[in-house]
Amino acid sequence: MANALDAVDWEDLRRQARHLENEIDAKLVAFSKLGVNTGAKLVNSDEVPLLDEEHVFENMASEIETLLAKLFSINEKMSKLQPNGAAMLHTMQRHKDILKDYKLEFNKIRNNFAARRDREDLLGSVRKEIDNYKNVSGLNR
């Protein structure tokens, strides 16, 4: 009887894991595109975007972190079930590998976004200093 319950639990957990993996995959694609598109700043400082790109990025990051935590929890539950064959062991390992890959991809995207933001901040401050220098040197002539 316990074996039949384990099989039902296994199938339910496997289905949940696949659903979360698909959802995470789609969100990572959107997250990656958002990270790439944030490089373009508005030329006219009077224009203000309706949603701050960094705010949207952080919200998406939070959503993905929550999904990754859920997937980790499901993988842990799967690991507690008694495997009844090589196929089940392989499937458990595959889900763990997918989670690891998603975490690596998520961290890479987030780190690239932070590096791009830092670079843009630095370039922006250098541009301001150059403009200030031009204005001051123009007055001294």
Feature map (PLM): residue ranges:
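Regulatory linker/N-terminal fringe of the SNARE motif in t-SNAREs
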Residues: 2-16, 23-141
